[in-house]
Amino acid sequence: MFNKISIKTFFKKFDYILLGLVLALTAIGVIAMPSVVDTMNSGPSILKTQMFSIALGLVLCLGFSIIDYSFLRYWGIVFYIIGLIMLIYVIPFGYGRDDPNIGSNSWIDLFGVFSFQPSELMKVAYMMFLPSQFELLKEEFSIKRLIFIAISGLLPIGLILLQPDLGTSTVFAFSFAVLIFVYGIKYRYLIISVAVLAASLPFVWLFLDTWQKNRIRVFIDPTFDPSGAGYQTSKSIVALGSGGLKGAGLFNGIQTQGNGIPVKESDFIFSSIGEEMGFIGCSAIVILAFLIIIRCIYIASKSHSYYGQFIVAGMAAMIAFHFIENIGMNIELMPVTGIPLPFISAGGTNLIGSFAMIGIIISASIRRDQIKRI
């Protein structure tokens, strides 16, 4: 479970750069959140959850960095199966579909004490398990294993679509595609995969609720339903445009303090930060996000094991897509899908899962010279 490295070696090889970038991004959220939720009745509760999730996330981050990441290949299948069970359970028994801010049965409530989103935890399990299978395929090609990987990769995506949660399913699909790319798929297989994906889009459309279809229509045509499905993005653009270079200042944003921005603590926190912290605040987020992903790519490229390359690349892809989608939907470059902004948005499960992935990536960085399996 623990690679035989000394405490001195651990601290010497610890990736302070990656952790520092993540903490800097988290700090922006900690600074902005009190202002963002100030006029919300649930504001105090959101802040408490945010602080608790960050603290727990940091503990998990440190814990996973201590554990030899290559050990996770043996437990990935266990966590993957548990994740599948939760994804199946949440479809009929979860909650959120009747909530206009959620729209899908994505959450499980535990005795009224706390709730969590299984798909967020599944992201970590997914990236523990699939890289181990790609590693085996890399070592010895097998049609049976290729089919097994295809089924294992697509099954969670299908279950999440049934909730229906288009945004999260897209995160999984993107990360799965990155794993295939890292593996080095032949072009003919890539063309076939793209063709199958394109052919499946009409079937995916059938599973979407009307409000999800309208969001896609608004993305294609911004003038479609500006007071309904297009309301969120229109308010987001207004907030960003009014922020200017330095912003209106914390607790001074008209849209943010007037509750003009829907889901401003999560999906549209980027626009709230843009209004109150301006172009400078938004630029800081984009730059830090870019540096985090670049650092992860560097770690993956330096790993001497296939598992290390796959697990870091896959987790980096998940985090990267969150950045791209969330910021993109805030500036009308992507359809609105309810994807949170990593390390900044309110949302305990996503925060905890994201920190856990960073911990695993740091573990891979510390042990990047490791080749043999434990």
Predicted regions and their residues:
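P-loop potassium selectivity filter motif centered on the GYG triad
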Residues: 241-249, 342, 350
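Short, Lys/Arg-rich, polar N-terminal cytosolic tail immediately upstream
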Residues: 1-11
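A juxtamembrane structural motif centered on a specific transmembrane helix
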Residues: 1-3, 33, 326-374
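Long extracytoplasmic/lumenal interhelical loops at the membrane interface
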Residues: 244-280, 307
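Transmembrane helix boundary and interhelical junction motifs in multipass membrane proteins
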Residues: 165-170, 248-253, 264-266, 283, ...
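Hydrophobic alpha-helical transmembrane segments of multi-pass inner membrane proteins, especially
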Residues: 19-27, 31-35, 39-232, 271-331, ...
